[in-house]
């Protein structure tokens, strides 16, 4: 099983200078994400797993994969707790 984070479709967002700015229409709250959180946000399309996202982070920031995965999990948990991300679990097909 692996998590496949997905952006909450109820939110409006734009990327400005490489950083995501997210607006919650329910309460007009604005969330400004840093570069790393923005990478996770833009990758969270429901098709890329946490492992996929961690791999991109490891390559981009030149850190070991376990470090990138720990950071990705922490940020995904934080964004999910704020209602910005939704996460789906599914079985990963061999060779997929």
Describe these PLM feature segments.
Residues 26-96:
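Long, charge-rich, low-complexity alpha-helical segments
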């Amino acid at each position: 099983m692996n998590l496949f984070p997905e952006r909450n479709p109820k939110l409006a967002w734009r990327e400005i200078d490489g950083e995501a700015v997210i607006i919650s229409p329910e309460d007009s709250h604005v969330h400004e994400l840093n570069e790393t959180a923005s990478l996770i946000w833009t990758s969270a399309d429901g098709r890329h797993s946490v492992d996929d996202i961690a791999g991109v982070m490891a390559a981009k920031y030149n850190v070991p994969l376990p470090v990138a995965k720990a950071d990705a999990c922490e940020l995904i948990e934080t964004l999910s707790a704020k209602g910005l991300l939704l996460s789906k679990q599914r079985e990963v097909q061999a060779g997929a």
